[in-house]
Amino acid sequence: MTEFKLMENCKLGLMPNKGIAKILADKTPHPDQGNGIPRCELYLYVENIKLEFENAVKIGAKLISEIEDRDWGDKVCYFADIDGHIIAFAEKLNK
């Protein structure tokens, strides 16, 4: 599992398909059966959306939607990772 420290008391853990499949065993379909199908969205507020957008493009994340002002009050861009999960980088429009 890869862990990201988001705050002093908050970590985000991302587990590869094979790792979570061992834990879930036969209680759910194997995650590989749904590869490429969005199964979750990570919506991350960031300090510099343009920088995060450029970083995601640089590492080869699949662009889903460019940076846009959204009607819920955020500026957001969307990518998909190699497993098809959606990753959103967002900033509040009225900081």
Language model segments and positions:
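Vicinal oxygen chelate
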Residues: 1-47, 53-80, 91-95
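Conserved ATPase active-site switch/coordination loops adjacent to the nucleotide-binding site
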Residues: 83
